[in-house]
């Protein structure tokens, strides 16, 4: 699949595990792992970080083999949903980082251009989540003020 703001194809460097069988090397039971995932979600840990912890600490390469579904869907089904989805939150954070950089380095044209690209992607994702009712219809990102 092509990237949004470049001519590259965006091939991923990682490969999903081929086998979809249940991992036999787990030391914890499935219920303990599920309760740990719910606890991490309650603490505010984003779903990608939960997946990284499952991979590094428990040896689970693919969370859907143990949980039966994706981490995000599992958390939604158990009532642990973040107010703002992780991808939108990271885009807002990236836009704020660029804006604070531009407050210091006002003539950085490359950063200005990247801010335009990140902002357009952020508003596009926000429109999608408003349509899907994941965020309120009047949601606006909390952005850093740009000095003139």
Curated annotation (Swiss-Prot):
Keywords: Ribonucleoprotein, Ribosomal protein
UniProt lineage: Eukaryota, Fungi, Fungi incertae sedis, Microsporidia, Unikaryonidae
InterPro entries in alphabetical order: Ribosomal_uS15 (IPR000589), Ribosomal_uS15_arc_euk (IPR023029), Ribosomal_uS15_N (IPR012606), uS15_NS1_RNA-bd_sf (IPR009068)
Coiled coil (UniProt feature): none
Family assignment from sequence similarity: Belongs to the universal ribosomal protein uS15 family.
GO cellular component, one term: cytosolic small ribosomal subunit
Organism field: Encephalitozoon cuniculi (strain GB-M1)
One GO molecular-function entry: small ribosomal subunit rRNA binding
UniProt xrefs under PANTHER family: RIBOSOMAL PROTEIN S15P/S13E, SMALL RIBOSOMAL SUBUNIT PROTEIN US15
Protein name: Small ribosomal subunit protein uS15
One of the protein's GO biological processes: translation
Source organism superkingdom: Eukaryota
SUPFAM superfamilies per the UniProt record, alphabetical: S15/NS1 RNA-binding domain
Recorded name of the encoding gene: RPS13
Xref: SMART domains: Ribosomal_S13_N (SM01386)
């Amino acid at each position: 699949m092509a990237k949004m703001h470049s001519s590259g194809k965006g091939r991923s460097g990682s490969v999903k595990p081929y086998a979809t069988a249940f991992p036999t090397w787990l030391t914890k039971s499935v219920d303990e792992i599920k309760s740990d995932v719910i606890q991490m979600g309650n603490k505010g840990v984003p779903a990608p970080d939960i997946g990284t912890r499952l991979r590094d600490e428990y040896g689970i390469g693919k969370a859907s083999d143990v949980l039966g579904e994706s981490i995000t869907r599992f958390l939604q089904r158990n009532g642990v949903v973040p107010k703002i989805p992780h991808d939108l939150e990271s885009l807002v954070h990236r836009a704020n980082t660029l804006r604070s950089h531009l407050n210091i380095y006002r003539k950085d044209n490359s950063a200005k251009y990247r801010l335009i690209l990140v902002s357009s992607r952020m508003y596009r994702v926000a429109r999608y989540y408003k349509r899907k009712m994941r965020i309120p219809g009047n949601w606006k990102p909390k952005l850093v003020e740009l000095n003139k």
